[in-house]
């Protein structure tokens, strides 16, 4: 799950 979180964080920052 940590790996997926990294990608999610990038998207959240964009928003």
From Swiss-Prot:
Q: For this protein, what reaction is catalysed? A: ATP + H2O = ADP + phosphate + H(+)
Task: Decide whether keyword Cytoplasm is in the record.
Answer: yes
What is the activity regulation comment for this entry?
Answer: The chaperone activity is regulated by ATP-induced allosteric coupling of the nucleotide-binding (NBD) and substrate-binding (SBD) domains. In the ADP-bound and nucleotide-free (apo) states, the two domains have little interaction. In contrast, in the ATP-bound state the two domains are tightly coupled, which results in drastically accelerated kinetics in both binding and release of polypeptide substrates. J domain-containing co-chaperones (DNAJB9/ERdj4 or DNAJC10/ERdj5) stimulate the ATPase activity and are required for efficient substrate recognition by HSPA5/BiP.
Chief site of localization: endoplasmic reticulum
A single Gene Ontology CC term: cytosol
Entry's localization field: Endoplasmic reticulum lumen; Melanosome; Cytoplasm; Cell surface
Which branch of life, at top level? Eukaryota
**What residue ranges carry the coiled-coil annotation?**
none
What is any one GO biological process for this UniProt entry? maintenance of protein localization in endoplasmic reticulum
Keyword annotations = ATP-binding, Chaperone, Cytoplasm, Endoplasmic reticulum, Hydrolase, Nucleotide-binding
Keyword Endoplasmic reticulum set for record = yes
Q: How does it assemble?
A: Monomer and homooligomer; homooligomerization via the interdomain linker inactivates the chaperone activity and acts as a storage of HSPA5/BiP molecules. Interacts with DNAJC1 (via J domain). Component of an EIF2 complex at least composed of CELF1/CUGBP1, CALR, CALR3, EIF2S1, EIF2S2, HSP90B1 and HSPA5. Part of a large chaperone multiprotein complex comprising DNAJB11, HSP90B1, HSPA5, HYOU, PDIA2, PDIA4, PDIA6, PPIB, SDF2L1, UGGT1 and very small amounts of ERP29, but not, or at very low levels, CALR nor CANX. Interacts with TMEM132A and TRIM21.
- State the function annotated in the UniProt record: Endoplasmic reticulum chaperone that plays a key role in protein folding and quality control in the endoplasmic reticulum lumen. Involved in the correct folding of proteins and degradation of misfolded proteins via its interaction with DNAJC10/ERdj5, probably to facilitate the release of DNAJC10/ERdj5 from its substrate. Acts as a key repressor of the EIF2AK3/PERK and ERN1/IRE1-mediated unfolded protein response (UPR).
The protein, known as: Endoplasmic reticulum chaperone BiP
Q: What is the lineage of its organism?
A: Eukaryota, Metazoa, Chordata, Craniata, Vertebrata
Gene expressing this chain: HSPA5
